Amino acid sequence: MPPIVKKGGITMTIIEAINRLDKIKPNGYGQEDKIEWLSEIDGMVKQTVTDTHEGGEDISFTGYDATTPLDTVLLIPIPYDSAYLDWLAAKIDFADGEYARYNNSMTRFNDTFLSFSRFYNRKYMPKGSKIKYF
């Protein structure tokens, strides 16, 4: 799967996201749960961001599960990759019933995800209907 940022860009892997989250937010959730949650966010990236732009078909994504290699590169590049940590933190907060923390985590996630979406819109041409000239 080619990353969104071409050669020379810096990206995060599944295991890096999990390790960084566990370091800043110790929790009792297993690696499989976190991989599933990472699959959710990259599924959103694929469906709502990359597939709506030219070249989106070059980015393949079929989801992550326990059999996915942990060195798989995630889709959102630096400096927007903190979205992964905020998303995972929000999922944990919600599962733990910590709704005020969940709201804070989701606010941070939404801000970063929106910034990433805007970056992608500037970098890649959105798909659209072709204009017919008479």
Task: Tell where the protein language model's regions lie, with residue ranges.
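Conserved short "hinge" loops at termini or chain/domain junctions
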Residues: 1-73, 111-134
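Charged, low-complexity interaction regions
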Residues: 26-30, 95-100
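Generic detector of ordered secondary-structure context
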Residues: 33, 80-81, 101
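Short, charged, amphipathic alpha-helical segments
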Residues: 35-36, 103-107
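Structural motif
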Residues: 73-82
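Short, hydrophobic/amphipathic alpha-helical patches that form generic packing surfaces
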Residues: 82-94
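Generic alpha-helical propensity signal that fires on short helical segments
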Residues: 98, 106-110, 127
